[in-house]
Amino acid sequence: MSVINLSDLDLNSKRVLIRQDLNVPISNGVVTSDKRIKASLPTIKMALNQGAKVMLMSHRGRPIEGDPSDGFSLQPVADRLSELLNTTVRLEKDWLDGVEMNNGKVVLCENVRFNVGEMVNDDELSKRMAAICDIFVMDAFGTAHRAQASTYGVAKYAPIACSGPLLSEELDALGKALDNPKRPMVAIVGGSKVSTKLTVLESLSKIVDQLVVGGGIANTFIAAQGFNVGKSLCEYDLIPIAKKLMEDCEIPVSKDVVCGKEFSDVAEAETKASKDVADDDMIFDIGPKSAQQLADIMRNAGTIVWNGPVGVFEFDQFAGGTETLGKAIAESNAFSIAGGGDTLAAVDKYGIEDKISYISTGGGAFLEFLEGKKLPAVEVLEQRALEVIKLA
């Protein structure tokens, strides 16, 4: 990846517009999880310390474009930023015609999705955003897979468009895991359906040494080996694809599973061999023998990419597989990267965040990167960097 980095630029007295991912949970006007806000602070401080005029922008939720509802306002985020930065962070509601501010100060622009044309990458809106800054900084990996006005269009027209530290760090970590991995390389892909992760599975099967499948996805692979999966979620029409993937790549399939009769936090869990699943069983987790097999694979791995739990870990009786796997990844000497909402929830639940080499902030963007797709917001930064090289 060849892009301009924020750290390479002189920011003194410059109008710096930073696209961040401040889409955080809010209850009764108060931020309930400020992880993303805290992650954004080093970039903000870098610009402030150089005497820049700092304008932050982000989306929050899915409001109706053109309808600035208080329910989707970024005011609670501005309040929390003010506390964390120990300075007043003003929320700018009308910012598209420019913001009056002094050097070394920061404002938060109101929800970008209040602007008509944001989601469809409207050209005129993109130009208006670009006109209020000297430097545009893309620092929201979680939205890098979306070609929208505040992620893509503004980067086309801003005088300078660069990558922020968060985005650069994310891309470096993913590149290290996928482009030049230490072997053996192992990927874990969980989720409810093969169909939703098919492109990821096919892409990873070409580069990994072992591919671990979990969750509902694993049921289709168990069925592909001729075993009964009872009433479990299973895509029987994709069994030929599962068989093809198993021919192309080493995919360890569970020899034992944990079943229940209903999807419930009070359902009784029963461990049994995969070959003994009854017609009225539902598979909700891998069994302890299979979990131990996966743990051994993780401990010997050189690179681990983790996207998705291997069971219904939200229910404690079906959480053993994901817990064993997660702790084995944490204990491994491998370079490990974890991404996806359910995966991060598991990382939090088992307290292993500081033992994973890199935690990806992106959901959809993380998946698309694993699929081998170009991320539009990164692609446009590469194009802008190329223009600078040609002019030099």
From Swiss-Prot:
| GO molecular function annotation | ADP binding; ATP binding; phosphoglycerate kinase activity
Query: What's the EC number here?
Result: 2.7.2.3
Q: Which Pfam families match?
A: PGK
Tell me, in one coarse class, where this protein mainly resides.
cytoplasm
- Positions binding ATP in this chain are 197, 314, 340-343
Where substrate binds, per the record, is at 21-23, 36, 59-62, 113, 146
Principal EC category: transferase
Output the InterPro entries linked to this UniProt entry. Answer: Phosphoglycerate_kinase, Phosphoglycerate_kinase_CS, Phosphoglycerate_kinase_N, Phosphoglycerate_kinase_sf
Q: One Gene Ontology cellular component annotation?
A: cytosol
Kindly list the biological process annotations in GO that this record carries. Answer: gluconeogenesis; glycolytic process
Q: Describe the reaction catalysed, as an equation.
A: (2R)-3-phosphoglycerate + ATP = (2R)-3-phospho-glyceroyl phosphate + ADP
- Quote the subcellular location field of this record: Cytoplasm
What's the domain of life for this entry? Answer: Bacteria
User: What is its pathway?
Assistant: Carbohydrate degradation; glycolysis; pyruvate from D-glyceraldehyde 3-phosphate: step 2/5
Q: Which UniProt keywords apply?
A: ATP-binding, Cytoplasm, Glycolysis, Kinase, Nucleotide-binding, Transferase
Similarity field:
Belongs to the phosphoglycerate kinase family.
Instruction: Check the record and name the PANTHER family matching this protein.
Output: PHOSPHOGLYCERATE KINASE, PHOSPHOGLYCERATE KINASE 1, CHLOROPLASTIC-RELATED
Q: How does it assemble?
A: Monomer.
Protein name according to UniProt? Phosphoglycerate kinase
> Which organism does this record belong to?
Vesicomyosocius okutanii subsp. Calyptogena okutanii (strain HA)
Give the lineage: Bacteria, Pseudomonadati, Pseudomonadota, Gammaproteobacteria, Candidatus Pseudothioglobaceae
Its gene is: pgk
